[in-house]
Regions:
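Conserved beta-strand signature within the Rossmann-like core of class I S-adenosyl-L-methionine
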Residues: 172-179
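Conserved SAM-binding loop of SAM-dependent methyltransferases across substrates and taxa
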Residues: 79-90
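Class I SAM-dependent methyltransferase Rossmann-like catalytic core
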Residues: 2-68
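Class I S-adenosyl-L-methionine
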Residues: 181-223
Length: 223
């Protein structure tokens, strides 16, 4: 049986995430970092769900990814900080999807589903009456400490998110997703160049200095 490109991406993503090594973390180091992080303190003071809210705020301030009334699909949305920002800055129909439980967000539709399963595509279609102006993805697999492994895993999730973007964006729409430093490359970069007019990479100030994450912003989707 010959698999389609879409089927290969779904299968590859699951295999990459399943076989990667588990990371050994230091809870003490993590707690100390949280205490000293100004964006953590700001998020707590302003009632944000997480410091990640400031990443998408800064991305939007630089690249204007939201327009008033835009509909937004937020992939891997938990705990919901990007969803809240999307509602504040766009305010259109907003669908947040994650395999994890999420507390409700006023005016957002929340779907608990595994994006690695093709059934999620059908669920999104049932919940949305039209395609989306913006597709977001802050998805990242837990890191292992092994740079090449972490890059491969994050690249796999970015490819998965791009697949959803191509399926669900309106003509002229915008895709914003987390990638690792070095940006997009290989098949993912070719896919984005084929489907979008402009592609930029940006590391917002809210991204921790020691983090390898950066973001790809692809605008002008060609339906």
């Amino acid at each position: 049986m010959i698999m389609s490109k879409k089927e290969k991406i779904f299968r590859t993503t699951k295999e990459v995430l399943k076989t990667a090594k588990r990371r050994k973390t230091s809870s003490t180091r993590w707690l100390q970092r949280q205490i000293n992080d100004p964006y953590v303190r700001q998020a707590q003071a302003e009632g944000k769900r997480s410091r990640a809210a400031y990443k998408i705020i800064q991305i939007d301030e630089k690249y204007k990814i939201f327009n008033l009334g835009d509909s937004v699909l937020d992939l891997g949305a938990a705990p919901g900080s990007w969803t809240e920002v999307a509602l504040e800055r766009a305010g259109g129909f907003t669908l947040a999807i994650d395999i994890l439980d999420m507390d409700s967000i006023k005016k957002a539709v929340i779907l608990k589903a595994d994006l690695q399963e093709e059934e999620s595509v059908d669920l999104i279609k049932k919940l949305s009456v039209d395609k989306f102006d913006v597709v977001l993805s802050d998805m990242a697999a837990s890191t292992t400490g092994h740079k090449s492994t972490d890059h491969i895993r994050t690249q796999a999730l970015a490819e998965l998110a791009a697949l959803y973007a191509v399926d669900f964006l309106k003509n002229g729409g915008t895709f914003c997703a987390k990638v690792f430093q070095g940006g997009t490359h290989g098949d993912l970069l070719l896919e984005l160049k084929k489907n979008f007019k402009t592609i930029k990479h940006y590391k917002p100030d809210a991204s921790r200095k020691g983090s390898p994450e950066t973001y790809v912003i692809a605008k002008g989707f060609k339906e």
